[in-house]
């Protein structure tokens, strides 16, 4: 791989990060010069004494990025040790007679070239070992010691035992983490059992709600205890309890016509009330026909309960439909056997009187006795006047 500015900048940043160097501890060569001559050092780092530096890791990183065999050169400048980093090792500095050990002594102006091959040779084990370097001050003046310390197992057997221990610890930590996660989930409410319980509760609530199309109509209100209307015959006696109304259709409400509940229990419908009135009027007509055949007239006492019952029935139904306005003139409605005033007029004019004729309205029945009395008085007056005038006529004749 050819050297470019991007690769140069990446190598410099990686060196500063791995060796943990400050801004003043690393001197960087210009990228243009490195691109023209890769044999120059990319950067020079000033190392501190008694500080551990990851040399092997940095060499591996440079090798993977440049596809070359990099080399680091430790050089004693008299007052400190500098580390020169090369992408390619200079030919004049690389000698076959050099030797790199775990403990190296550097005098003034002496150098130590270190590559990955040298570090692998001093490793006690080929696997699981990371080599680091430490610069120490020697007892002699201007002399430094470079120590390459291998951190890891001492041999291959120890490395294998170390791997077994590491794998066992990892498996134990994994199982413990899974157990703790399950315990925390069960306590916090995110476990599968609690989720299943919540889902079942939600389904139960959803099943309890029915759509408006499939929901059955609400039950009708209870029947009033005193709501048992009876049928009144022509003679004024009760003919027995009224037969029960037909069953209501689903979703429908009927209006009660009985006197006790005042339309609150829904025990009868409008059609049932009309049928009952027709039956009562038919019974009254039959009673009148029987009395006429026997040569008797139906009195007010025998006909009054029937008319009062019919008027009350009609008044209740009219009240529950809509409150009517008082009419200007009393309207007549056709009954089963004669013309009679409306229920509203009968309710305000009191109980009906015996009718004087087959087609005479009921409101004129009360005027009959008065008219007859007036006629009788006039007849008596006329007769008295006639008797008083008869002696005068006889005197004139004489």
Swiss-Prot record:
GO terms for cellular component: host cell nuclear inner membrane; membrane; viral tegument. Residues 202-246, 306-334 are annotated as: Disordered. It is found in: Host nucleus inner membrane. The keyword Nucleus does not apply. One of its GO terms (biological process) is viral budding from nuclear membrane. It holds the Pfam family Herpes_U34. Residues 215-224 have a biased composition (Pro residues). Residues 1-359 are perinuclear space. Keywords: Host membrane, Host nucleus, Late protein, Membrane, Phosphoprotein, Transmembrane, Transmembrane helix. Residues 311-323 have a biased composition (Basic residues). Belongs to the herpesviridae NEC2 protein family. Forms a heterohexameric complex with NEC1. Interacts with host UBA7 and RNF170; this interaction promotes UBA7 proteasomal degradation. This is Nuclear egress protein 2. It comes from Human cytomegalovirus (strain Merlin). The gene is NEC2.
